[in-house]
Amino acid sequence: MEVEKDWIRPRENTVEALVYGMINSDGVELDLRLTEDDMLVLHHDSKTEFGEYPECLTINDLPEYVETMDKLLENKDFIRRWTEEGAFTCIEFKTPHPSSGKAGGWFNGREKEQHMIKMIQKLDELLQPIERSSSSTVIYSFDPKIISASKKINTNLEFSRLRPNIRSWGNWTTQRIIATPSFLANSLPKLIDRQREEGSPMLPCSLQYLKGIESKINIGWTVGLEGKKLDRLTKYRRGYPIYVWPAKSDSERLLLDAGLTGLTDDLSPNSVTLDSGHARWIKPATQPLTDEMRKELDETPMGEHASKISELQEEIPSWYELSDSERRNFVEKWKKKWLWEREIGTLLSETAESSLPWEVSRIIGHRGTGKSHRGGS
C-alpha cells in the first residue's frame, strides 16, 4: 500500500464520500433530512452553510453540495457492496430545528412523529426495489419519536434509538450539556435493556459509555473495553450489537477486540497504524482475518504496516468469496469468543455471501469518510 499524499477526504454526506466509505470499510453511516418538497437529502446540520433550514427549502433551492438519497441509490458500486458483499448502512434521521417551524416547532410532539412517519414512508418507497439482507440496514434517530412512528407503519425496515438523547438545536457544547443528566442516569447495561425492550436490533451509543471518566460516573453497572469491565460487558450484552462513535485511533482496536462496531471519522488510505501501535484493518467483517493472519499482521514491524496491509488485502478473500463452510467457521468462532446468545441456526440463517449476522463487529465510515466540521454525531 503506497502512501497517497494527494488523498483529500471527500465532503461528508456526499455520494463520493459514501461510496468511498462503502468500498473501503464494512459500511457507512449517513444522515437524512426531508425537504419542503418531500425529498430525502444527505445532510447532517440543522442549517446549510448559508444559514438556511433544509426542511424549509425545495430540492432546487438547496445548495449544490446537498445531494439526494435517490442519487446515492443510483450508484452501482454502493448498491453492489450493500446488496452483494455484506456491507452495512446506518441511516440517521435528522429532525428539523425547532425554530424552522417544521415538525411542530418547539412543542408539538405529534407533528414531529408525523414528520418521522413521512420520512419512513419516503425511505421505504426508495428501498422497495432494492433486494437487501434483513441484517444489512438500520434506521435510527436521537428523537425518541422514531420508535413510535415506526410502529404505525407497515414496513420491514429495522429501527433503533441513538442514546443519550441529543437535541436538534444548539451547538455541540450545548447539546452535550443538555444531554448530561440523561447520560449520568443511564449506564450502558441499562441502555441495552431498554433497546431490547423496544425491539431494536442494536444500540448506537457514545464512546463515553465505555472509555474515560464519564464511563465511571453514571448510575448502574460500569462496563468498559478492558479487564473485568470488558468481561462484564461481554457477559451482559451476550452478543447484542453495539455501534460506538467515535472510534478514534486509540480506541478502534479495543472496540474490535471487544466484538463491538466502531464508527470512524478517519478512512484515509494513509492511516495504516493505530495509536495503539497495531496495524489497521478496516474490513474486519467484509474481509475477515483468521487468527493466524491477525497474529501475522500484529507482529509486523510498524515501518512495514503499509506494505503488509496491501499484501493481505490482495491475498485474503472477501466475505462474499468465502465458501459456506468458511463463513460458518467464522460465525461459530465469533459466537464462542463473544458469547453470542442466539442459536447457531438463527445466526446462519442471516449468513450468506451477501450478508452477515447482526452481531458481527465492523468498522463503519461515519458520514462516509468522516465528519467535515466540528459538529456533533
Each model region followed by its residue ranges:
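Phosphate-group recognition and catalysis centered on beta-loop-alpha active-site segments
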Residues: M1-S377
